Amino acid sequence: MLFGRQAYVGLSSGQYGSLTLGRQYDSAVDYIGPLTVGDLWGGTFGSQPGDINNFDNTLRTNNSIKFSSRSYGGLTFGGVYSLGGVAGDFSRNQIWSLGAGYTSGPLSVAAAYLNVRNSNVSFFGTSSSTPLTAATTNMTSPVYSGYASAHTEQVAGAGVNYTIGPATLGLVYSNIRFLALGNTAESGPNPGRLSGDATFNNIETSFLYRLTPAFSVGLEYNYLRGNPTNGRSSSQYHQGTVGVDYALSKRTDVYVIAAYQRASGTDSTGKTAVAAINGVTASSSNAQTAVSLALRHKF
């Protein structure tokens, strides 16, 4: 399993598409992911706080079956189903997702839906069949780790990119819901004794400009809001990201990415919200900065 990401086998047909089995990305990653800043130029830092919608493919689906269609005049679609692996309970720990994308000239659009049962175990855990204890919390980001007891996690999103000459404009929206909190027997701990649902809404706006074929600059603003839950105030995360890339050759480039995030309100753990840029440990304060400078060679 190369770097722990994907490992799968399957069949492919130029007439219908492909059918694969193994450890794979979900449909939100496949269809919306390519339109996000994290995939295009911003890397891990350019993704949402804690990669809450998994558009940056932090998590994969194990024991999954995936269908990916061929392109029908620019339209592609597909779905993923991951077996829960619990004897006698077919739906427990199951994961399924659907997605579609369309590309025509300068326009690219996509939409996807992800449904995860007992996500603290099935998605964030290393194995859906690992025994659960009362203290098992596989979620690490304080943005949502307090919702480990959710029976179901849902992600619904859509995105669009439009290119005008050397400029590309991007907009991505996602709604993330942790449903039926308090399911400690199957999902995870609930120290805050929460009940009901927790909902987040995220908007990512971006602008990429190619000054020359080799030199590009990207800007992003991301806003994540967690709705009030169980009498707690809402949480809000504002992030700005800047990226500069210079291609030294067809396979080698040097880039710098800088992100700044500021948080407010009450996070999922019931504490004052702290900044949580994706890819680094959450801050101990409400503000955080992350900078990456790298030389990249593609093999």
Task: Identify the function of each model-found stretch.
Residues 1-84, 92-114, 259-263:
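Outer membrane beta-barrel
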Residues 3-5, 59-63, 92-96, 103, ...:
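Residues that define the transmembrane beta-barrel architecture of outer-membrane proteins
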Residues 12-19, 71-75, 103-108, 162-169, ...:
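Secondary-structure transition into beta-strands, especially the periplasmic turns and strand N-termini
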Residues 26-30, 84-86, 116-119, 176-180, ...:
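Structural signature of outer-membrane beta-barrel domains
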Residues 31-37, 121-125, 181-185, 231, ...:
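Outer-membrane beta-barrel and related beta-rich outer-membrane complex signature
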Residues 101-241, 297:
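Detector for outer-membrane/organellar transmembrane beta-barrel domains
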Residues 248, 285-299:
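Outer-membrane beta-barrel "beta-signal"
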